[in-house]
């Protein structure tokens, strides 16, 4: 009987499997120009039991994979902040692990003449408004993120830039002309062993003041200075530019994988990663990987 089992294992018929928990965050959107909307956070997908995915969703199921098989691995870069009047912040790039794809965060809108935020993993914020306009925030992807904020200029005739949506919450509507809108909140995960917040939306560009940002989101600019970038490898949105200033770049994404320490991961040449071991598991944090990169286990 044992010889039969060994033969089946050698033939790959009874090949062992491994269960992998993951946190996959996409690159975030860049902020808009000139009282621009904040960039939306990168899409957020998590399988750690008891934690949350983006968009208010519960944790997803872990993946069951085969050893000695290559699986796709990509870490999405953040989108560039807008540098010209009327130019929308660029959306980020998707992050991928095997069958899991997190959607890029949407770029923030720009004023003159004013534009809506871009749809994405989390949506970008609408730009500042004039002439009683309403510039809406972009929508977020279901189970990955929330919508960007809307700038409503119909109340007092003008509005500042609204914040980008976060993985953990939508950005609020802005109805005044001084302080830029708050970025949406992100989500915390302890997949690495300590709790870290990621996936915050970028703050909206203001006219003398800026709103709050958390979890890697970049602050909007209150004046003529360039807005802050989202934090690298958090999927935090770029801040919106203030009066005649540029938007900040979106933060790059990240892929974090937790698996039994009986297995060793092998990464293709374009991957930048670090691996720690403890409690019977290994945790690999991948901070850079191109569209053709892979990971396998043995």
Task: For each feature predicted by the language model, list its residue ranges.
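Low-complexity, glycine/proline-biased repetitive segments and flexible coils/loops
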Residues: 2-10, 18-298
